[in-house]
């Protein structure tokens, strides 16, 4: 009997599985986070936004220099953190009257987790 080399078959199977997992992760339930602030309010920025897990942090938009973004996203107070799922806004966290972010990293992360779990 001839021995069949199954190494390549296993490799191809794992590669197809990896491609499928990556595709599903990118195609469904994509969470993005944007922090809006202004240069003059840097002291009240939420630096922990970049440490949020299971989401893509788009970054920081300075509404003092990007008035179009302020208008488009209806930013009334800064800092503001907006969470998007599949391109739609699903949550917003805003500062208090002293321009300080009230929400904690844990609260924002919990919202991200809730949004991810809502797909199941």
Segments the model singles out, each with a brief description of its role:
Residues 42-44, 69, 91-93:
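Extracytoplasmic/secreted cell-surface and envelope-processing proteins
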Residues 63-70:
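N-terminal post-signal-peptidase region of extra-cytosolic proteins
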Residues 73-84:
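Structural micro-motif
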Residues 83-120:
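Non-catalytic, surface beta->alpha helical segment in thiol-disulfide oxidoreductase systems
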């Amino acid at each position: 009997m001839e021995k069949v080399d199954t190494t390549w078959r296993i490799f191809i199977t794992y590669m197809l599985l990896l491609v499928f997992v990556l595709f599903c992760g990118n195609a469904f339930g994509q969470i993005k986070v944007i922090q809006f602030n202004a240069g003059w309010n840097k002291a009240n920025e939420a630096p922990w936004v970049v440490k949020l897990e299971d989401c893509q942090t788009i970054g920081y938009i300075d509404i003092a220099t990007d008035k179009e973004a302020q208008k488009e996203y209806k930013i009334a107070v800064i800092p503001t953190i907006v969470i998007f799922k599949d391109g739609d806004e699903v949550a917003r966290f805003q500062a208090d009257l002293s321009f300080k972010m009230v929400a904690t990293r844990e609260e924002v992360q919990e919202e991200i987790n809730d949004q991810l779990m809502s797909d199941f």
